[in-house]
Amino acid sequence: MSESTGVSTIVVGVDGSESSILALRWAGALAPLFQASIRAVTCWQFQIAVGTFTPVLWNPDEEARKICAEALSQAFGDSTPVDVQMVISQGPPAKVLIEESRRARLVVVGSRGHGGFEGLLLGAVGAAVAEHAKCPVLIAHGSDLPPAFPEVAAGPSTIGSNQAGSAHAGS
């Protein structure tokens, strides 16, 4: 998607964590309101450590694609919104999401991802994206959506259905 298309896009950082699944649900709830497509972005990068090697058979793109697909399945079940694009990108997640924000209406990230410290309210990626993004950022925190989105909070069975979209249109 380019900046000149005029299509509204919600970018979501996806790492497979519960927090990123909640971020996907937020994007699913907001997409009809913004008439937006969703870009589910999963990043990978080589971890450099002294005395180790990268397995030759490791396919990071495929692993990231599986993580993203599983997160979409957990977030939406069989009701994945029609206009969802999986984006697999090599690089630091914060840098990739900030770059994605240049062409987005909104970026949604979870409050904590994998590898974070348990007591933190906001992870390093979320903090960096919130500070440097070129569009508004929503940081999904907790475990539920607000009551304004009951069909989404109810779980995967009704997310993205035509009834869910029409319920939002009247409010």
What are these regions (language model features)?
Residues C68-F76:
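A conserved short alpha-helical segment within the catalytic HATPase_c
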